[in-house]
């Protein structure tokens, strides 16, 4: 009988495959306002978070609340930022989509009012506010998808800092290893056809080939569920 394949071991949830979330610094969300329309804070530090590729700005607000937020391009320690409906339109400030002029790049956009921000949070990306009225705000995401959102959903003005990160090569396998380890991903990943028959359904043989159809049912047992899972079509003519 063969050994458990890597997909089965990952499903068990051991420390090798589990994300080290105890090292993550914060779950980013917009500051909630209860008694005031707008509040002011000062950037007191810029930090790195292993959970994400973008730098974080530590903000100290007037009410002595400290929190980490995504740092847009152009902000620095000592800058003043505002959160609220009457905030100035400048990078780092957070306000509802209804109060932001059309065409302004925004980041950390809420999907539903009060959820803290879900869209455009990776380094170097931004969404664009296309238009808004009393009932709906239309936002184009970095992928090109257009979303219709509640105009009271909040967003931060600017482009997320850290752009150009993907243009720098890893150079060494060790750098890639540490990057993947910070996110709880096993690296390097060995191809199934390069394994022995005991280790993978595609392993073994005198040459590297699957030796069986790669398409597999969605209901296949865990030890067989490898390859093209529940594929609608395969091959070079898949766009037809």
Swiss-Prot record:
* A single BP term in Gene Ontology: cytoplasmic translation
> Is Secreted set as a keyword in this record?
no
The protein here is known as: Large ribosomal subunit protein uL2
- PROSITE patterns referenced in this protein's UniProt entry, alphabetically: RIBOSOMAL_L2
Segment Disordered: which positions?
A: 1-21, 198-240
What Gene Ontology terms describe what this protein does at the molecular function level?
Answer: rRNA binding; structural constituent of ribosome
Q: Which InterPro entries match?
A: NA-bd_OB-fold (IPR012340), Rib_uL2_dom2 (IPR014722), Ribosomal_uL2 (IPR002171), Ribosomal_uL2_arc_euk (IPR023672), Ribosomal_uL2_C (IPR022669), Ribosomal_uL2_CS (IPR022671), Ribosomal_uL2_dom3 (IPR014726), Ribosomal_uL2_RNA-bd_dom (IPR022666)
The species this protein belongs to is Halorubrum lacusprofundi (strain ATCC 49239 / DSM 5036 / JCM 8891 / ACAM 34)
